[in-house]
């Protein structure tokens, strides 16, 4: 397992981003936590970020957002980034509804590593981080 260096929160709800950032800070104060409010901003952020400095990265992706939603983000992400980049990004797709259909759709995408139901808690973050990172 690799050591987690950064988390990118992609959600149009500022309150959700604030709370998630708070939970993460309680777990590990050394982590770099960035927030963007839609998929388009996430793509721009990932293109601009100095690759090595922030990898590996945990990307928490909401499904429903304006401008570019989570599904559209995944389509652009697939085309824009190479395999070496993608192997260092763990994408967890957030679902507001715990439906098998949404989970199955997310998990059928090769770039999605896991799904989680909103809202996240400090316990859910701890489980996700421990599952994929040392």
Descriptions of predicted regions:
Residues 65:
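Receiver (REC) domain active-site loop signature in two-component systems and cognate sites
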Residues 50-60, 89:
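Active-site beta3 strand of CheY-like receiver
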Residues 12, 92-98, 119:
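Conserved active-site segment of CheY-like receiver
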Residues 35-44, 48, 70:
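Helix N-cap/capping motif at the beta->alpha junctions
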Residues 5-16, 20-24:
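Conserved acidic segment of CheY-like receiver
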């Amino acid at each position: 397992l690799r050591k987690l260096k950064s988390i990118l929160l992609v959600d149009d709800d500022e309150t959700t981003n604030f709370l998630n950032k708070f939970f993460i800070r309680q777990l590990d104060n050394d982590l770099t936590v960035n927030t963007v409010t839609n998929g388009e901003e996430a793509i721009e952020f990932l293109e601009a970020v100095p690759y090595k400095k922030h990898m590996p990265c945990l990307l928490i992706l909401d499904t429903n957002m304006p401008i570019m939603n989570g599904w559209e983000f995944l389509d652009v992400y697939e085309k824009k980034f190479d395999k070496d980049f993608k192997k260092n990004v763990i994408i967890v797709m957030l679902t507001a509804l715990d439906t098998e259909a949404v989970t199955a759709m997310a998990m059928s995408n090769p770039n999605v590593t896991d799904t989680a139901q909103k809202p996240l808690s400090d316990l859910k973050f701890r489980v996700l981080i421990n599952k994929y990172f040392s």
